[in-house]
Amino acid sequence: MLKPLGNRVIIEKKEQEQTTKSGIVLTDSAKEKSNEGVIIAVGQGRLLDNGTQVAPQVSEGDTIVFQQYAGTEVKRGDKTYLILNEEDILAIIE
């Protein structure tokens, strides 16, 4: 399993819908890149210049919205994960 360092989080992206509401099947090139995912692992938080550790605002299992082109994709086995900085997370979906 991947363990994020610092203020990074690892997410599993939500799959984009294969069809539109009207039933049209989308090709891979027509689909928009998903910017939602579920947090799989969270780093220990950000370290300030004075040495203070700031705890992350998100936790494992949170469903989030993140910036469209943020992060680095990493493949482990048959799954693809995205490693993001916590600052790239825009919102938690409740």
UniProtKB/Swiss-Prot annotation:
Pfam families in alphabetical order: Cpn10
InterPro entries for this protein: Chaperonin_GroES (IPR020818), Chaperonin_GroES_sf (IPR037124), Chaprnonin_Cpn10_CS (IPR018369), GroES-like_sf (IPR011032)
The keyword Hydrolase appears for this protein: no
Keyword annotations from UniProtKB, A to Z: Chaperone, Cytoplasm, Stress response
Keyword presence, Transmembrane: no
Cellular component per GO, a single term: cytoplasm
Places the protein is found: Cytoplasm
GO biological process, one term: chaperone cofactor-dependent protein refolding
Example GO molecular function: protein-folding chaperone binding
Main location: cytoplasm
Family, as annotated: Belongs to the GroES chaperonin family.
Role description: Together with the chaperonin GroEL, plays an essential role in assisting protein folding. The GroEL-GroES system forms a nano-cage that allows encapsulation of the non-native substrate proteins and provides a physical environment optimized to promote and accelerate protein folding. GroES binds to the apical surface of the GroEL ring, thereby capping the opening of the GroEL channel.
Subunit structure as annotated in this protein's UniProt entry: Heptamer of 7 subunits arranged in a ring. Interacts with the chaperonin GroEL.
PANTHER family referenced in this protein's UniProt entry, alphabetically: 10 KDA HEAT SHOCK PROTEIN, CO-CHAPERONIN GROES
Name this protein carries in UniProt: Co-chaperonin GroES
Organism: Staphylococcus epidermidis (strain ATCC 12228 / FDA PCI 1200)
Gene: groES
